[in-house]
Amino acid sequence: MNKTAIKNFAIWARNKLIADVSYDARLIGITEDGIAKPLPQSFGGTQFFDIGTAEPYSISGEAVRQRDKLIEVIQQKEKDTDYKTAYQYVIEEVAYTWFNCLIAIRFMEVNDYLPSHIRVLSSESGKLEPDLVTTPFDAELPFTAEEEAQIFQLKQDNKLDEVFRILFLKQCNALNEILPALFEKTKNYTELLLSLSVIDQDGVVYHLIHDIPEDDFNIERGGQVEIIGWLYQYYNTEPKAAAFAKNGKITKEEIPAVTQLFTPDWIVRYMVENSLGRLWLEGHPDCGLKENWKYYLEEAQQEPEVQAKLAEIRKEYAALNPEDIKLIDPCMGSGHILVYAFDVLMQIYESAGYSQRDAAKSILEHNIYGLDIDDRAYQLAYFAVMMKARQYNRRILNGENTCHVYAIQESNSINRAHLKYFGAGMDDIEKNAAKMQLEGLLDTLTDAKEYGSILNVESYNCCLLYTSPSPRDMRRS
């Protein structure tokens, strides 16, 4: 893996994406200095903005609604800080959203994991024009008649970047059906700030394809899904340095960048083999797996009394089935430990007679759990675990699958005045009990993005909370 190329690309791509997103925001009157109102000549569903050229910039229809949502998001963030910081936070958020989508699609297309089996960012023949742009209607993406006509006309006019933008958004929305935690529906303000080119050799897409060797993504040629984690760590290089350089208090927003550290492979293997691996070997010493584990340490000689206690423990472990094992990484980052744990669990399942296809589904459902305070790291951990499952089960993305990795959320923005509506339709005893439980949970999760997994979350009656009807439920009935 060429980590120098990966690092150089990630750092450069972050700055490039932020610059591009900021430029697109400026076109619609949104800058770090403030939000401009549309020009007076705006009418109906069309808005005009002064960008210093002879003709004003205009948006209409859905783009107007997307701009309104973008303003709403910035103003909501501004409640916790100042406008400039809120603006920078949202611009950074949009930039990393598209960065995550780009590197995920690159991994999927190189490994032929895309449902259409048609490359989105590159061409198998090496031409500049991506295969999806060449044959857009072979990918089985949903198009309206109007969209098909638009694509035909744009291709005829040789406006490849405009064709690519339409198709890229279509592909992201299609991937939402199989990987919803990473590929969000793009009919929001992030779509308004998307400016990608496939023909510009100074663009992010061109550099992604040409700067990082394709084999680094290809798992059949020595590549690993862990490249996603390395890209994310290097993406945070400059924010991390800036946070440390100010020599002051680290803000909540800066914690993910300054604490993100991609664990070296040998440490991951050592930890997993001597925890998860040892757990299984204690009860199944003849499974023959430890020969595959380079960093597994044999147990030291113990005193007779200790040996007797260990023998009792081994009896319990001997009754374990693979589905009984639960492994959690409470600060999972981009999922490096979980990905290797998936490999070890696969070996355990196979030693117990499972097929790779059944084992992959069971590992997702029963074995692997993860938490992180960083929403973007969570997205990549989710993606990495799902791609590892896809490696063993080519149909895993065809159906609904539960992946137990989560981003810790805090309760700061929840309006507790709304609790008076909670539990409508319940008797007073149940309603008060549910309300007390919910208030306790909200108290615990205050500033959870700062504390993360060190929080001590008490046991709650989840069945009561989940079944408590809300005002929306009552309206439905």
Where are the model-predicted features located?
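SAM-dependent methyltransferase catalytic region
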Residues: N247-S468, R472, S477
